């Protein structure tokens, strides 16, 4: 590993003032099973570092995968050359740190003792259980396992010296079912660093039952319907629109929430939380990509917008404190802004009670086309969808080949009820099930 002090000394000698090093090490495993054979297998250890430094008032950047002292001359010269060619500075600053950082339990060493063979045997068992459940299961078209450990170190010349280690694990499987020439597919995740949660029989049963429930799907007539959005669908839509809360998007006029702090932007029953300390959260961390201590915040409270999400740079522009939402997707990336674990606050209302409230409408369990069918700035969307009829307060026939259309900002205002079934899926952004007063539906 590169000697941080030697790097900083070389930087000072070359004319750099403030400097920062960000090191990431990843140890990842993945495998996939198909027809009881290992279809793919990968185990890798990668590491890299990014370095930035202030030269003549401008912040230069570089990165490398060569993390030893022999790379120091390259790192220093690259940062200086990068700073020289910058036409202007965005007044970036390095952070000196906070007095207190919350200690989080993000690393679970027991999981790393699980052998590759145990994971492969689990996948084979899932595949076997799926086929054993129903003769209409024609294929387990995806059955995979992934886990890994990530270590981050962040140190600068202003006294910041932070590190954090966390691990993750998840599996995903999907099945294809066939009846009378009709094909349907569905899948599900298990996300946990406790291997006892990986139970093949119950996992397979959930996947197969969901796929079989879609057989015999019908179209519905075009019109305007009360809509119940499945929790994962609502979370996916929120994730696709999450940049609207970024201070950077506000400054670039890429969000309709500009100048809306303190104003009503959603139904009074809606609160949106960003919680970096959530247990088992995919985005949990005690510090952000710039070393700012993270904390839980309500972005929206009872429909009112409280705050944007900020890095050091945007916080300075808005003359507010940073929110701990600076992010780096990898050691190669520059500092951006993103949520940690963001979600719509659940209530005590059960899923069955939501159905009772709606009485008659549509339950949307899947949408397609979020990248092409949703405008992340205007909020307009038109998405292919499938799900179930809601009739007399109960789930009825499956439906497919429909399109739901509307606007995200209008949707926030039309939320009539919120469930208790908060789910993130394989993401850091989640939601409970949402009852939307009405959406336009194109069918037959």
Model regions and ranges:
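N-terminal small-residue-enriched
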Residues: 1-444
């Amino acid at each position: 590993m590169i000697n941080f002090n030697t790097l900083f000394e070389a930087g000072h000698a070359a004319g750099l003032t403030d400097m920062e090093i960000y090191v990431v090490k990843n140890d990842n495993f993945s495998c996939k099973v198909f027809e009881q054979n290992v279809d793919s297998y990968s185990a890798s250890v990668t590491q890299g570092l990014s370095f930035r430094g202030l030269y003549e008032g401008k912040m230069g950047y570089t990165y490398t995968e060569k993390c030893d002292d022999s790379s120091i001359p390259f790192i220093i010269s690259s940062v200086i050359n990068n700073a020289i060619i910058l036409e202007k500075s965005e007044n970036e600053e390095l952070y000196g740190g906070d007095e207190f950082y919350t200690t989080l339990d993000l690393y679970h060493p027991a999981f790393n003792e699980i052998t590759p063979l145990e994971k492969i045997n689990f996948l084979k068992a899932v595949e076997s259980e799926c086929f054993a459940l129903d003769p209409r299961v024609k294929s387990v078209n995806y059955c995979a396992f992934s886990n890994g450990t990530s270590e981050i170190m962040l140190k600068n010349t202003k006294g910041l010296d932070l590190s954090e280690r966390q691990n993750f694990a998840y599996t995903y499987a999907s099945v294809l079912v066939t009846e009378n020439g009709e094909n349907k597919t569905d899948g599900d995740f298990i996300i946990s660093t406790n291997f006892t949660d990986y139970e093949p029989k119950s996992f397979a049963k959930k996947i197969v039952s969901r796929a079989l429930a879609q057989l015999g799907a019908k179209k519905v007539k075009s019109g305007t319907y009360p809509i119940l959005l499945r929790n994962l669908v609502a979370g996916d839509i929120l994730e696709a629109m999450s940049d609207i809360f970024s201070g950077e998007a506000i400054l670039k006029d890429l969000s309709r929430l500009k100048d809306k702090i303190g104003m009503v932007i959603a139904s009074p029953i809606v609160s949106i939380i960003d919680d970096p300390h959530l247990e088992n959260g995919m985005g949990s961390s005690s510090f952000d990509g710039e070393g700012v201590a993270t904390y839980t915040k309500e972005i929206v409270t009872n429909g009112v917008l409280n705050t944007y999400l900020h890095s050091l740079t945007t916080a300075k522009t808005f003359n507010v404190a940073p929110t701990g939402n600076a992010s780096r997707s990898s050691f190669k990336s520059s500092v951006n802004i993103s949520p940690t674990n963001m979600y719509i606050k659940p209530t005590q209302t059960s899923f069955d009670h939501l159905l009772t409230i709606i009485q008659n409408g549509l339950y949307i369990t899947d949408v397609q086309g979020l990248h092409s069918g949703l405008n992340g700035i205007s909020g307009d969307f038109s998405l292919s969808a499938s799900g179930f009829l809601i009739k007399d307060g109960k789930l009825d026939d499956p439906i497919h080949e429909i399109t739901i259309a509307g606007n995200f900002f209008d949707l926030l205002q039309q939320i009539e009820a919120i469930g208790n079934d908060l789910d993130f899926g394989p993401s850091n952004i989640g939601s409970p099930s949402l009852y939307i007063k009405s959406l336009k539906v194109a069918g037959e």
